[in-house]
Amino acid sequence: MNKRITRPTWAEIDLSCLQFNFNQVKEILGSNVKIMSVVKADAYGHGVIPVAKTLVEAGTQRLAVAIPEEGVELREAGLSVPIQVLGEVLPSQYELLFKYDLIPTVGREETALSLNRLAAKYNVVKKVHIKVDTGMGRIGVRPREAVGFVKKVNSLSNIKIEGLMTHFASADERDKSYTYEQWDKFKQVLDGLNKLRIDIPIKHSSNSAAIIDFKKFGLDMVRPGIMLYGLKPSRDLINNIDLKPVLTWKTRIVYLKEVPPGTGISYGTTYVTNRKSKIATLPVGYADGYPRILSNQGQVLVRGRKAPIRGRVCMDQIMIDVTEIPDVRVGDEVVLIGEQGTQKISATDIAEKADTINYEIVCGISQRVPREYKNKIGG
C-alpha cells in the first residue's frame, strides 16, 4: 500500500538536489580528494538507502555511519563501497565489523588488540582508521599519545591502519582560531609519523564546515554531512556556497472552522482568539518531529502565504490561523519546510525559532512521516 495515500503528511526527497550538492563538494576539492559521504541517522532523516544509492551513483568513494547497525543496513541493501563506522564500538558489536566488512574507528588500545585477535581468528587483516582527539573531547587518542599509539597498533600483525582522522569542533563558528589550533595539533601528529616513516594512506579531518571554509584542510579525504542535504552548518561560515535543500515537508488541511472572539485554541488554551477567526487543523505534530516549542510562534505556508501556529503543538495535530488567507479549503497543501509560491520556510528558520540546529530538525522527522523520492538518477 502506498503510504502517501494513507497519510496526508509526507516528506519529499529530491535526489537531484542531493546529486547537485555532492557535485558542489567535488567542485570545491577537485579530483584528487576522496569523498566519504556521511549517511548516519538515516541520512540525516532523509532515508538512508535511496540517499546512499544516489551518492554512490554520483561518485562517492565511501560512506560513513555512526554505529555498526547502520552499516549492516547498507550492506543488506546491496551497497558494496567501503563503509566506516565513525563512533566507538563495543565488544558486543565487533562481530558485525567482520561479518559485514565495516571499517572501525579506533582510539583505544583495548579495541585494537581485540580486533587484532578476531582478525587472526578469521585469518584476515582488518583495516582501521585511528581517531585523534585534537579538541573535540569526545572519542580518540590525545595528540601527545597519538604517535606512540599508532606505532603500537601498526605493529599488530592482523591490523592495517588505513586512515588517520580528527574532527573539528568549531569549524562552523565565526572565530576560526580553535580550528587552526586543532589543525596544528593534527599536523604535528602527521609530522611525527612521517619522521618514523609510518605511511598512512588516508588522512582526513574536514566536515562540512571545514570543506566550505578550510579548503586546504582537505588532505586525502573529506567527510561531508549536512551540506549534502542542502543545509549549511551555520550562518557563521565565511565562504558562500550554493546548496539546494533536499527535503520538503508537507501536509494538508483536514479541518476548517470559524470561531468567535474569545475562543481558546489547543491544550491549556495558551492562545485565545481576539477576533472572529478561521482556524485550520493539520494532521501533524510533535510525534512527527515538529517541535512543540514552536507553539504560538511557528509558521507554515498556505496558498503561498505564511500562516501562524495558534496554541500548543499537539502530539498529532497543529492548529493554524488562516483568517487572512482567502479561499482556503480542506485538502489544501501546506508546507512546513520548503517553498510555496514566493515564500520559503527552511529547516534553519525552524531551528532558530526552536533554539536548536537544522541538523536536529531534519533528523527528528519521525518514521511515521512517509518519504517520497523524486528525480532518481537514471529514472
UniProtKB/Swiss-Prot annotation:
Keywords in alphabetical order: Isomerase, Pyridoxal phosphate
GO BP annotations listed: D-alanine biosynthetic process; peptidoglycan biosynthetic process
Pathway given in the UniProt record: Amino-acid biosynthesis; D-alanine biosynthesis; D-alanine from L-alanine: step 1/1
Transmembrane segments: none
Annotated positions binding substrate: 138, 315
Active site per the UniProt annotation: 40 (proton acceptor), 267 (proton acceptor)
Any Pfam family the entry gives: Ala_racemase_C
NCBIfam families in UniProt: alr
Membership in a protein family: Belongs to the alanine racemase family.
Protein name in the entry: Alanine racemase
Organism for this UniProt entry: Halothermothrix orenii (strain H 168 / OCM 544 / DSM 9562)
Organism lineage: Bacteria, Bacillati, Bacillota, Clostridia, Halanaerobiales
Recorded name of the encoding gene: alr
